[in-house]
Amino acid sequence: MSTKIAINGFGRIGRLTFRNLIESDKVEVVAINDLTAVDMLAHLLKYDSAHGRFNGTVTHTENSLIVNGKEITVYAQRDPETLPWGEIGVEVVVESTGFFTNAEGMGKHITAGAKKVVLSAPAKGDIKTIVLGVNDDQLTDADTMVSNASCTTNCLSPMAKVLDEKFGIESGFMCNIHAYTSDQRIQDAPHSDKRRARAAAVNMIPTSTGAAKAVALVLPQLKGKLDGYAMRVPTITGSATDLTVQLSREVTAEEINAAMKEAAEGPLKGILMYTEDPIVSSDIVGDKHSCIFDAGVTSAKGNLVKVLGWYDNEAGYSARLANLVERLA
């Protein structure tokens, strides 16, 4: 019997995660909670500017979505504690509103009757962070609340894992070249970050990211060794992580590429993809790998190495989120 799933927050990640979960034979999405009108939720699920039309049928009633003939109840509650998760048998909740990112907030779903909660964002406080392929061996049956980290941490961590295990990382710095998101202005307008206040579709915008430091949550041996920043660019989706590291010994670009290829074909298969093709960002839109390693960019000088990993910050991340839900189901 399929495990019953609810999604709290039906935005970009919520909808794309739904697209993955609806294809699973292990889980069943039975409820969605979002304050948006149901007809709008149906429209945004059916049509997607970045990822195309939904491969199936989408209709709606006043209080439900009907997807491929299956009715999914839609709630509109601000406080997750008021949701009837226990009554309808929900076991795992995808928390993708962006608001309930600590134990207190995520715990509201437990109070409402759910057994486990998966967060689609970096967590605040003492919540276990899991990056599939990197530290998912730490998952236990006792884990009731876990974070899927960020899309960038999911891209960066597999590369860092391979580099550290094979050659040893002494220190490093990354630039996250990231597609614009809803936390930017499409025209110049006030924002708490003066750079993000500028028009997203016509500017390259430097801003902060915690992704590099967050790697230490899944690879604790790298604590204090990595830092970085983000450069938001005018693409709707499709991003890249440019990582420069000092290793414990001198290496060649060929050694680095060989290590990445071995990992991509072995323990990180399905998470890390290796390519020697001269690709660009549009080539990886819709790709569900966490990281597409671009061997043609690799360079090395002594123990100083630069590598590049592409990722669809929406499709890849939501695929991992769905995988993590299935692991907990």
Q: What do the predicted segments below correspond to?
A:
Residues M1-A197, S299, L321-N323, R327:
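N-terminal Rossmann-like NAD(P) cofactor-binding subdomain of oxidoreductases
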Residues F10, G14, N102, A149-T152, ...:
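Generic structural signal for well-ordered, non-membrane alpha-helical segments
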Residues I22-K26, K161-I169, A179-S182, T209, ...:
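Generic secondary-structure signature for well-ordered alpha-helical cores
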Residues L35-V38, P80, A123-K124, S150-T152, ...:
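Glycine-rich beta-alpha junction loops
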Residues L65, I130-L132, M145, Q187, ...:
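Short clusters of hydrophobic/aromatic residues that line enzyme substrate/ligand-binding pockets
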Residues A142-D143, A199-A201, G238-D242, L304-K306:
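Short, solvent-exposed beta-strand edge segments and adjacent coil->beta transition regions
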Residues E165-I236:
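Acidic, glycine-rich segments within the central catalytic cores of soluble metabolic enzymes
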Residues G228, A240, T244-A329:
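C-terminal active-site/capping subdomain that shapes the small-molecule cofactor and substrate pocket
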